[in-house]
């Protein structure tokens, strides 16, 4: 996105999440940024919180995993569906979030709509092009939650975006007693 420093948001956000014991599964532009930053290397476990570091060591995996191009989001939704089936929970109850911190193409919003419609809160680091309509903004960030138990959150400050994502994940973990 020409309005922001390329890859900065992706990398800072991933580092913040793994430092807070949150494994990152990604695709598309964020995967390229992660690879360039070495976050998909097993040695990146040293940037993790103690819990995720232990998981990475036991499973012999890096803390950031790649699942394809941006339009391969269905792979992540299949994973969420399998986690839902195995746990007996609705997808919306799982401690998962979606994020497009530096989205640059309208397809990212279409993909985000899929994630939200699946029941996963989705966080954006760039304003979607709907701010001209307060009604549309309301429906995407609040109103849709009544239908699908998820919505968009928009926060342009990467540090605050990460905090909001972590808070949402922790809220869901607490509700599950984990």
Kindly label every feature range from the protein language model.
Residues 1-178:
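Anaerobic metallocofactor- and corrinoid-dependent redox/one-carbon enzyme cores
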């Amino acid at each position: 996105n020409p309005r922001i420093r390329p890859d900065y948001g992706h990398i800072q956000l991933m580092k913040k999440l793994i430092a807070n014991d949150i494994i990152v599964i990604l695709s598309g532009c964020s995967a390229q940024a992660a690879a360039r930053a070495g976050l998909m290397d097993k040695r990146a476990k040293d940037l993790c919180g103690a819990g995720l570091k232990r998981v990475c060591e036991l499973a012999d995996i890096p803390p950031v995993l790649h699942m394809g191009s941006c339009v391969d989001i269905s792979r992540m939704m299949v994973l969420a569906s399998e986690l839902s089936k195995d746990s007996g929970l609705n997808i919306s109850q799982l401690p998962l979030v979606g994020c497009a911190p530096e989205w640059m193409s309208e397809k990212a919003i279409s993909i985000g709509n899929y994630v939200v419609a699946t029941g996963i809160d989705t966080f954006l680091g760039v304003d979607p092009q709907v701010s001209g309509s307060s009604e549309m903004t309301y429906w995407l960030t609040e109103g849709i939650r009544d239908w699908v138990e998820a919505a968009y959150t928009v926060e342009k400050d990467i540090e605050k975006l990460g905090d909001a994502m972590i808070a949402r994940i922790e809220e869901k973990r607490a509700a599950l007693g984990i």
